[in-house]
Amino acid sequence: MKKLIISACLLGEPCRYDGKSKPCEAIEELKKHYHLIPVCPECMGGLPTPRPPAEIQADGRVVNREGRDVTANYRAGAEATLEIARREGCTLALLNEKSPSCGKGRIYDGSVTGTLTDGNGVCAALLMENGVQVLGESEVEKL
């Protein structure tokens, strides 16, 4: 069975910044075809749940709403996720969209106003740079 890295919040784990989950309706179908490997890069990077929301700034730093630079946590979580992908031989990931760690293609712009911009989250970018195909949850039909 093929392996799929998946954002833990999409599996129903309450690990999002707000302490909630974001269950993906297609999970039961995915389980029929993939061995799901849950990850939460933000938690794996040492951030608590719940936590202040954070966004990637124009200079690449990740800063939370309180003004704290949490870039190191995001990088650590991304590296831990990449290590899991390598160890498991996983070349495919389904991640939570718009997230500063997992977002692919569109993320919040750093102004903490809910404005989206083109870009990738820290973890999504690292996975893609290392040959892992990343899809957002709205692309689940591509699996």
Where are these regions (language model features)?
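Short, active-site-adjacent cap segments at secondary-structure transitions
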Residues: 12, 45-47, 100-103
